[in-house]
């Protein structure tokens, strides 16, 4: 018997054992883990797709803006330090942001089967610091998925965007409306329209995004974990394409 034959036999045995254990209720049917960065401009659909990824992979969704606000509200050591900097008009350092992510990975039970990072990294130094921290933990990134879409379409999309602040779920007045006007489908909470979701503010954010993000995309291309998805498609098709990128289709 060749080495390849042995490997095939072992794989079949492992699959059979897993099946029998699950059937007997010995272990839960835990999905494949995920360790990824979701990249995309404001309005590309990260707020639509990230909750889907979280649910499918039983992983945590780390939207760094929300995470920062939560740490400040909780008055954690990192949150207090970050608030002091923000109150002085400064930018929170890369070290603080990476340590916040590290704290979530170590203390948030939802992160035990992986994580979806959203909104970080935005610069090459941030990407390098993140990689260093994750490699030290032996949980390196496996995928960097970019949601690609033309700026003109984004303007049409984002000016009708509605958000559920607590979960990050997002809707659109025309393209993806909630079942009840201005009400979140899942929780029944009121939806809000962000103050910076207007055309002028968006165009400024897009200039910053392109300037920051193009080098990040190149960085992940070079590491071999980047893949791109056409985010101008309907959400269901975008979801299918993301799963293909993650080897699930």
UniProtKB/Swiss-Prot annotation:
Consists of three domains, a large central CORE domain and two small peripheral domains, NMPbind and LID, which undergo movements during catalysis. The LID domain closes over the site of phosphoryl transfer upon ATP binding. Assembling and dissambling the active center during each catalytic cycle provides an effective means to prevent ATP hydrolysis. ATP binds at residues 43-48, 161, 170-171, 233. AMP binds at residues 64, 69, 90-92, 119-122, 126, 194, 205. The lineage of its organism: Eukaryota, Fungi, Dikarya, Ascomycota, Saccharomycotina. It catalyses: AMP + ATP = 2 ADP. Residues 160-197 are annotated as: LID. It is found in: Cytoplasm, Cytosol; Mitochondrion intermembrane space. PANTHER family: NUCLEOTIDE KINASE. Residues 63-92 are annotated as: NMP. Monomer. One of its GO terms (molecular function) is AMP binding. Catalyzes the reversible transfer of the terminal phosphate group between ATP and AMP. Plays an important role in cellular energy homeostasis and in adenine nucleotide metabolism. Adenylate kinase activity is critical for regulation of the phosphate utilization and the AMP de novo biosynthesis pathways. PROSITE patterns: ADENYLATE_KINASE. Its EC number is 2.7.4.3. One of its GO terms (biological process) is DNA replication initiation. HAMAP family: Adenylate_kinase_Adk, Adenylate_kinase_AK2. The gene is ADK1. The keyword Amino-acid biosynthesis does not apply. It comes from Debaryomyces hansenii (strain ATCC 36239 / CBS 767 / BCRC 21394 / JCM 1990 / NBRC 0083 / IGC 2968) (Yeast). One of its GO terms (cellular component) is mitochondrial intermembrane space. Belongs to the adenylate kinase family. AK2 subfamily. InterPro entries: Adenyl_kin_sub (IPR006259), Adenylat/UMP-CMP_kin (IPR000850), Adenylat_kinase_CS (IPR033690), Adenylate_kinase_lid-dom (IPR007862), AK2 (IPR028587), P-loop_NTPase (IPR027417). Keywords: ATP-binding, Cytoplasm, Kinase, Mitochondrion, Nucleotide-binding, Transferase. This is Adenylate kinase.
